[in-house]
UniProtKB/Swiss-Prot annotation:
NCBIfam families tied to this protein: coaD_prev_kdtB (TIGR01510), cyt_tran_rel (TIGR00125)
A GO biological process held by the record: coenzyme A biosynthetic process
Subcellular locations according to the entry: Cytoplasm
Binding site residues for substrate: T10, K42, L75, R89
Quaternary organization: Homohexamer.
Name of the protein: Phosphopantetheine adenylyltransferase
Native source organism of the sequence: Chlorobium chlorochromatii (strain CaD3)
GO cellular component, one term: cytoplasm
Cofactor(s) required, per the database record: Mg(2+)
Residues the UniProt record annotates as site (Transition state stabilizer): H18
Residue sites binding ATP per the record: T10, F11, H18, G90, V91, R92, E100, Y125, T126, Y127, V128, A129, S130, S131
An example molecular function term from Gene Ontology annotations: ATP binding
Organism lineage string: Bacteria, Pseudomonadati, Chlorobiota, Chlorobiia, Chlorobiales
Length: 164
């Protein structure tokens, strides 16, 4: 049986840190589905369709990875429905872990057969967050070391629209 996991997030935008966690997950699982979800508590720069498109382009050459959208519903149920055995979460710092630990316990109550796997990114990405990338980029800062060129181009396009 093929070992499958999901890697959920808003990915607004998908960063090199996200890619690093995905690649680490693929050393454990044969298939990882990057699940792009909405989060009503976050203000998105990119539409869910834009995020899916950018992420698909970035991971197109990553064996074992594919991208899906979860428009609504519980993540644990989605994981079970697609046959995933695990939910992969990137953890950069203690604050991330506290939140993710709570979510892990809730998901375990909802679907006991699904486990959560916490992966730390490469140390050079521990301070990289999508929210920081967006803020720095929209203020004209150089974020090219933290995002794929596709993302950089899309951010620059958004910034140009805002400057009009």
């Amino acid at each position: 049986m093929k070992q499958k996991a999901i890697y959920p997030g808003t990915f607004d935008p998908f960063t090199n840190g996200h890619l690093d966690v995905l690649e680490r997950a693929l050393t454990i699982f044969e298939e990882v589905i990057v699940v792009i979800a909405e989060n009503s508590q976050k203000r998105a720069l990119f539409s869910i369709e834009e995020r899916k498109m950018m992420t698909e382009q970035i991971v197109s050459n990553v064996d074992g990875a594919r991208v899906e959208v979860l428009a609504h519903g519980l993540l644990a149920n989605y994981a079970r429905d697609v046959g995933a055995r695990a939910i992969v979460r990137g953890v950069r710092q203690v604050k991330d872990f506290e939140y993710e630990f709570q979510m892990s316990l809730l998901n375990r109550q909802l679907c006991p057969e699904i486990t959560t796997v916490f992966l730390m990114p490469n140390v050079k990405y521990t301070y990289v967050a999508s929210s920081i990338i967006k803020e720095v980029a929209m203020l004209g800062g150089d974020v090219s070391n933290f995002v794929h060129p596709i993302v950089l181009s899309m951010i620059n396009d958004k910034r140009a629209l805002c400057e009009r």
